[in-house]
């Protein structure tokens, strides 16, 4: 180990930065966030330093490097564009036994600055020892995606509860189980982020009052339309914390590969017109697993609240008193249209967009008169089997027969395929496409030839 990682308490302690440019500004920002009493010495300063000085946040000393400024310092940073000056700062600090960082010169420095993930009071520092700053930055970005944004607030709140936890739970094992449930409780984290004191208190009391073995919850997560890169950061965090993942056919293999390795997986294989597991049984699976104390993720393609029957599943949980939360996903209409070069709205062609199910309950009927209106875009989910009917009804209610249409198969994935034509061809085009597929109807489809960026198919 070439360097010892430490965290410095700099609040109200004198620190010095030599340099007044962009690099020095970035270092100063970190020092100010840490509460340092900061002096900045340079020949010239970029405007941000003057702003900070006018606000009383730091002291500026204009002129050549003055090593007497180090006499009362705990820490120093040399951040000029002059290697000779930087070395003078380092030597002067070394003679006073003051730690000094020299920007872009780790061998001349007595400490190096890591890449930082700040979830105060939780801090994560990543360093390559100065050998590969880009690698450290890339690793930091990866860790940023794994750590929830609200983690700091949860950590602070945990500190307030430590005494109560110690008093209520006698053994280390019980305390560990409590904290494990506490830190993965998404509703608590969201309530803290919203400063919703009532919800925070209610969730906290439930955590303390229920037996440790029966604190399961369900999180509905939208997996997006296919491309794993479209899974949200919060969605990724949830599937990596799950004890069990209940998923269906629209969730891609690439996304399932991101699920925690030791999590149980339950495939329920839904698609339009075919359910490998009936919806009521899915509801009961979620309920049963949560009642066992498990953290259950219900992973759905697209967005769980847009033709995903997420509301029905949550009603079952709500009736049983099971805690739940929802992580939205990019819905198929948004993802497939973007990856097909078809804007859903456009000032010249469409002032509104309608998301329509093509899979109605028996006896159901759509409002075809309004659907056939001009200056809008229609997106039909689960509409392949009804494509001929959609074509017939829209024309019958006045939509122009030459209205452009597109069918997007396996949208946003490497298997994406788009077929397009006009409304009179819709039923025929549907025969060329397999599920999962989306139907887009509107003048905006005509822009695809210019705006298609993702594939030639």
Curated annotation (Swiss-Prot):
Its EC number is 2.1.1.107, 1.3.1.76, 4.99.1.4. It catalyses: uroporphyrinogen III + 2 S-adenosyl-L-methionine = precorrin-2 + 2 S-adenosyl-L-homocysteine + H(+); precorrin-2 + NAD(+) = sirohydrochlorin + NADH + 2 H(+); siroheme + 2 H(+) = sirohydrochlorin + Fe(2+). S-adenosyl-L-methionine binds at residues 225, 301-303, 306, 331-332, 382, 411. One of its GO terms (molecular function) is uroporphyrin-III C-methyltransferase activity. The keyword Transit peptide does not apply. Residues 216-457 are annotated as: Uroporphyrinogen-III C-methyltransferase. GO terms for biological process: cobalamin biosynthetic process; methylation; siroheme biosynthetic process. Residues 1-204 are annotated as: Precorrin-2 dehydrogenase /sirohydrochlorin ferrochelatase. The modification Phosphoserine is found at residue 128. The active site is at residues 248, 270. Keywords: Cobalamin biosynthesis, Lyase, Methyltransferase, Multifunctional enzyme, NAD, Oxidoreductase, Phosphoprotein, Porphyrin biosynthesis, S-adenosyl-L-methionine, Transferase. The keyword Flavoprotein does not apply. Disulfide bonds: none annotated. Pathway: Cofactor biosynthesis; adenosylcobalamin biosynthesis; precorrin-2 from uroporphyrinogen III: step 1/1; Cofactor biosynthesis; adenosylcobalamin biosynthesis; sirohydrochlorin from precorrin-2: step 1/1; Porphyrin-containing compound metabolism; siroheme biosynthesis; precorrin-2 from uroporphyrinogen III: step 1/1; Porphyrin-containing compound metabolism; siroheme biosynthesis; siroheme from sirohydrochlorin: step 1/1. Pfam families: CysG_dimeriser, NAD_binding_7, Sirohm_synth_M, TP_methylase. In the N-terminal section; belongs to the precorrin-2 dehydrogenase / sirohydrochlorin ferrochelatase family. In the C-terminal section; belongs to the precorrin methyltransferase family. Then it catalyzes the NAD-dependent ring dehydrogenation of precorrin-2 to yield sirohydrochlorin. Finally, it catalyzes the ferrochelation of sirohydrochlorin to yield siroheme. This is Siroheme synthase. It comes from Salmonella gallinarum (strain 287/91 / NCTC 13346).
């Amino acid at each position: 180990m070439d360097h010892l990682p430490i965290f410095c308490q700099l609040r109200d302690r004198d620190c010095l930065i030599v340099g007044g440019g962009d690099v020095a500004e970035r270092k100063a920002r970190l020092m100010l966030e840490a509460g340092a009493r900061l002096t900045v010495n340079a020949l010239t300063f970029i405007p941000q330093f003057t702003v900070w000085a006018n606000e009383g946040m730091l002291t500026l000393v204009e002129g050549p490097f003055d090593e007497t400024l180090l006499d009362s310092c705990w820490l120093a940073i040399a951040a000029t564009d002059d290697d000779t000056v930087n070395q003078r700062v380092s030597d002067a600090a070394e003679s006073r036994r003051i730690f000094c960082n020299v920007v872009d010169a780790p061998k001349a420095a007595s400490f190096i600055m890591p890449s930082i993930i700040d979830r105060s009071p939780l801090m994560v520092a990543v360093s390559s020892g100065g050998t590969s700053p880009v690698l450290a930055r890339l690793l930091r970005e990866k860790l940023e995606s794994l750590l929830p944004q609200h983690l700091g607030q949860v950590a602070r709140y945990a500190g307030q509860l430590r005494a109560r936890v110690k008093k209520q739970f006698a053994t280390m094992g019980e305390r560990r189980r409590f904290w494990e449930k506490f830190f993965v409780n998404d509703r608590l984290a969201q309530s803290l982020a919203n400063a919703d004191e009532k919800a925070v208190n209610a969730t906290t009391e439930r955590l303390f009052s229920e037996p440790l073995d029966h604190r399961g919850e369900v999180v509905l997560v939208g997996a997006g339309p296919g491309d794993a890169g479209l899974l949200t950061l919060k969605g990724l965090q949830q599937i990596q914390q799950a004890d069990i993942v209940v998923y269906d056919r629209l969730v891609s293999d690439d996304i399932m590969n991101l699920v925690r390795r030791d999590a149980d997986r339950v495939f329920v294989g839904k698609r339009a017109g075919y359910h490998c597991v009936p919806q009521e049984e899915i509801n009961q699976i979620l309920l049963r697993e949560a009642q066992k104390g498990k953290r259950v993720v219900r992973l759905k393609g697209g967005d769980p609240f847009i033709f995903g029957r997420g509301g029905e599943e949550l009603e079952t949980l709500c009736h049983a008193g099971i805690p739940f939360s929802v992580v939205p996903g990019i819905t198929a209409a948004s993802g497939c249209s973007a990856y097909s070069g078809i804007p859903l709205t456009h000032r010249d062609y469409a002032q509104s967009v309608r998301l329509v199910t093509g899979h109605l309950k028996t006896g159901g009927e759509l409002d075809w008169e309004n659907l056939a209106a001009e200056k809008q875009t229609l997106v039909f989910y689960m509409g392949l089997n009804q494509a001929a009917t959609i074509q017939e009804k829209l024309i019958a209610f006045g939509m122009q027969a030459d209205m452009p249409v597109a069918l997007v198969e396996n949208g946003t994935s490497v298997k994406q395929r788009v077929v397009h034509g006009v409304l009179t061809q819709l039923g025929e085009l549907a025969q060329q496409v397999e599920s999962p597929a989306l139907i887009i109807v509107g003048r905006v489809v005509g822009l695809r030839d210019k705006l298609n960026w993702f594939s030639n198919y």
